[in-house]
């Protein structure tokens, strides 16, 4: 069996994940050793395999190998929900990841995975296998299916599945119609927060959050957790999520999200997710209005944490920021300086295994998610599962996610506010002056973005178990924008060619009341649009950059990539890149929605000195086209500056507005975002 064939066989394990291995998967019929078959099916496996086998299926014979000890891992039942916020689940996933990482080669891994497949909780199995495949050198070129294909129940209303199963059972392949999801299916317009549900519940955003945490696990050993500036990237990627959400709120006449700081008062936001777990066979619980966070005691999950614990952890972190150092497990002091301090703080806040002292600083971010997710049954009296905020895959659907992360980001901003302010000389680039910038959108006035609604189809058949094979599509509506380009005029008065990093950000022009911004309020509202290297010859230079080249986003086709289509050649560099780059922000949400009369925004462009920005490394064959939020596979973050530069610190004395903050290598352009309430039908 060739290595390519084995890799394809590993991908087949994602097909219909709750079905046993002896059922045909992705047109492959797996013949597993008898000892691999669970007791439930030992007497019927061959008969069922023959009955449901497909005539054109390929037979894959699995070798018998020494079997791993799964005893601890099996303490999580097959029909339970799985959450990486639950420490017990994190530990179990780390154990399974290490079992998969220690396999001698892909063929050995396939055999172990086939054994684990029918025993381990499906959510846990797919997560651990995905992390292992991404981080093993001999499988990193494997194209991992996106989670919509594997577990569509985490993305679609439960009504979709009854319609889908009917379509798959009754209607022949080729005659099936897409099942359309209404844009407003979780609440009515009477609910104010529902104005931005199209953004929170967007499939691409939730896939991005899932994939980011797949690439940056909190546990599993250094091979999967120890990545360059991962704590800082946790801070920055989530800060940008909150900033983008606030931008979207402004476009819908909502004020900035309020930080969740009162942990003993009522929470006004309710949320009813309308999702059912097809693995746990239970609905995700709702949260009604005015519930309060309470001490958690969930014996079945070994969770016991009090609100007072959270307050102690918060206060210790604030004290560390004020003191300028944290205390490591061995009692030594680690300075929170202006280079590594934000990274250390990020590891503490996320509470990854890179945290210098989990015992002292706790798990503030993670247990915040858990307290909110069990708010309906904090002591497990009713044996209710956690809500959507307790799962990376579904958390961004819930309005409370953004209130919690507004608090988390405020902790980081407390630290950023303690750092030395950039001087004008530090920000400037001698000899480089930006004289003009404009945005070009086809058939639109200069400096105007245009957005609209787009309908797209995604195949969910691979995640619908125990049904006849064949595609069944779900049609959903999402925001999109017209392609555009930046045209930047730069004057280089230096003695020769200069190299720089062009940094492009966008922010609302005024606050929610229509008042001019103070710089230190506006700086956290800027969303990164692009970052790229430029070469400036002497004299005037014109830089043109297309929106599709953004360092923040990945294309629509990669966000919703299919197992079989758009696949690069086996063994090619493109295939390795294709897989890791599933992490980027969805391109269809690069531009905020805007308003019909044109939402006023400010485009900020800066060119910094590349000599101060560059990181020496070979990026050939690495994924770096969505580097801003996801970094570079197997390499260092490709910008030496702090993430979010130059908006990561409080402004210098006297620079109380954006205009006063500017130096010669910066420019601001007023622009508008015009939304057309039209819907474009699916792409062919």
From Swiss-Prot:
Q: Which residues are glycosylated?
A: 81, 91, 330, 416, 487, 491, 546
Record field: pH dependence:
Optimum pH is 8.0.
Q: Which SUPFAM superfamilies match?
A: Di-copper centre-containing domain, E set domains, Hemocyanin, N-terminal domain
- List cellular component terms (GO): extracellular region
Residues annotated for Cu cation A binding in this entry: 209, 213, 238
Q: Name one Pfam family in it.
A: Hemocyanin_N
Q: Which GO terms describe its molecular function?
A: metal ion binding; tyrosinase activity
Keywords per UniProt: Copper, Disulfide bond, Glycoprotein, Immunity, Innate immunity, Melanin biosynthesis, Metal-binding, Monooxygenase, Oxidoreductase, Secreted, Zymogen
Tissue-wise expression:
Hemocytes.
Q: Which residues form the propeptide?
A: 1-51
Subcellular compartments: Secreted
Cystines in this chain: 581-623, 583-630
Q: How does activity depend on temperature?
A: Optimum temperature is 35 degrees Celsius.
How are cofactors bound according to the entry's free-text note? Binds 2 copper ions per subunit.
Q: What is its EC number?
A: 1.14.18.-
Entry keyword annotation includes Oxidoreductase: yes
PTM details?
A: Precursor cleaved by PPAF1.
**Superkingdom of the source species:** Eukaryota
Listed under subunit, the entry gives: Dimer. Might form a homodimer or a heterodimer with PPO1. Might interact with PPAF2 (via CLIP domain); the interaction might be required for PPO2 activity.
Annotated family: Belongs to the tyrosinase family.
What this protein is reported to do is described as: This is a copper-containing oxidase that functions in the formation of pigments such as melanins and other polyphenolic compounds. Catalyzes the oxidation of o-diphenols (N-acetyldopamine, 4-methylcatechol and dopamine). Cannot oxidize monophenols and p-phenols (L-tyrosine, tyramine, gentisic acid and hydroquinone). Binds to the surface of hemocytes and is involved in hemocyte melanization. Activation of the enzyme in response to bacterial lipopolysaccharides (LPS) suggests it may play a role in innate immunity.
Name this protein carries in UniProt: Phenoloxidase 2
List the lineage, top down: Eukaryota, Metazoa, Ecdysozoa, Arthropoda, Hexapoda
């Amino acid at each position: 069996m060739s290595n390519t064939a084995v890799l394809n066989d590993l991908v087949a394990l994602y097909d219909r994940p709750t079905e046993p291995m002896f059922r045909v998967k992705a047109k492959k019929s797996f013949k597993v050793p008898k000892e691999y078959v669970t007791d439930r099916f030992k007497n019927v496996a061959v008969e069922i395999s023959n009955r449901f086998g497909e005539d054109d299926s390929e037979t894959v014979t699995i070798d018998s190998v020494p079997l791993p000890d799964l005893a601890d891992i099996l303490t999580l039942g097959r029909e339970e929900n799985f959450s990486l916020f639950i420490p017990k689940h994190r530990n179990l996933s780390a154990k399974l990841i290490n079992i998969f990482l220690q396999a001698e080669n892909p063929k050995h891994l396939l055999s172990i995975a086939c054994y684990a497949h029918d025993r381990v909780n499906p959510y846990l199995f797919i997560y651990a296998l995905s992390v292992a495949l991404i981080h093993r050198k001999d499988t990193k070129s494997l194209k991992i299916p996106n989670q919509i294909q594997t577990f569509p129940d985490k993305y679609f209303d439960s009504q979709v599945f009854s319609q889908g199963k009917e379509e798959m059972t009754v209607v022949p392949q080729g005659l099936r119609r897409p099942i359309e999801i209404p844009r407003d299916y979780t609440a009515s317009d009477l609910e104010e927060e529902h104005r931005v549900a199209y953004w929170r519940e967007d499939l691409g955003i939730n896939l991005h959050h899932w994939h980011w945490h797949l690439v940056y696990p909190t546990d599993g050993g250094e091979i999967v957790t120890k990545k360059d500036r991962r704590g800082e990237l946790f801070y920055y990627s989530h800060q940008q999520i909150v900033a983008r959400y606030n931008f979207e709120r402004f476009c819908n006449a909502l004020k900035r999200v309020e930080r969740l700081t009162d942990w003993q008062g009522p929470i006004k936001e309710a949320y009813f997710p309308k999702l059912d777990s097809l693995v746990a066979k239970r609905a995700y619980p709702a949260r009604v209005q005015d519930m309060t966070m309470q001490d958690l005691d969930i014996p079945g999950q070994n969770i016991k944490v009090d609100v007072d614990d959270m307050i102690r952890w918060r206060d210790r972190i604030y004290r560390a920021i004020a003191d300028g150092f944290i205390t490591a497990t061995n009692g030594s002091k680690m300075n929170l300086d202006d280079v590594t301090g934000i990274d250390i703080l990020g590891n503490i806040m996320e509470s990854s295994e890179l945290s210098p002292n989990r015992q002292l600083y706790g798990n503030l971010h993670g247990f915040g998610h858990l307290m909110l997710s069990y708010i309906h049954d904090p002591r497990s009296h009713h044996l209710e599962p956690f809500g959507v905020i307790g799962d990376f895959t579904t958390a961004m659907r819930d309005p409370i996610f953004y209130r919690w992360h507004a608090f988390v980001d405020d902790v980081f901003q407390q630290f950023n506010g303690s750092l030395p302010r950039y001087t004008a000389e530090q920000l400037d680039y001698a000899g480089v002056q930006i004289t003009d910038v404009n945005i070009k959108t086809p058939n639109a006035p200069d400096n105007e973005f245009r957005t609209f609604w787009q309908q797209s189809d995604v195949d969910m058949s691979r995640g619908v178990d125990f049904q006849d094979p064949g595609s069944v599509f779900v049609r959903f509506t999402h925001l999109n924008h017209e392609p555009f380009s930046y045209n930047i005029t730069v004057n280089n008065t230096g003695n020769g060619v200069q190299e720089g990093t062009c940094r492009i950000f966008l922010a609302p022009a005024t606050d929610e009341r229509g008042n001019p911004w103070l710089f230190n309020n506006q700086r956290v509202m800027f969303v990164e649009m692009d970052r790229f290297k430029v070469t400036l010859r002497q004299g005037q230079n014109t830089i043109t950059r297309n929106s599709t080249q953004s360092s923040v986003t990945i294309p629509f086709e990669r966000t919703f990539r299919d197992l079989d289509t758009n696949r690069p050649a086996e063994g090619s560099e493109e295939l390795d890149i294709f897989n890791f780059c599933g992490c980027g922000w969805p391109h269809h949400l690069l531009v905020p929605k805007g308003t019909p009369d044109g939402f006023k925004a400010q485009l900020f462009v800066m060119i910094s000195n590349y000599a101060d920005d560059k990181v020496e490394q070979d990026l050939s064959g690495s994924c770096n086209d969505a580097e801003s939020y996801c970094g570079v596979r197997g390499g260092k973050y490709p910008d030496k500056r702090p993430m979010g530069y130059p908006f990561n610190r409080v402004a210098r004395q006297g620079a109380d507005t954006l205009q006063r903050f500017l130096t010669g290598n910066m420019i601001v352009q007023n622009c508008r975002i015009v939304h057309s309430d039209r819907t474009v039908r699916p792409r062919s």
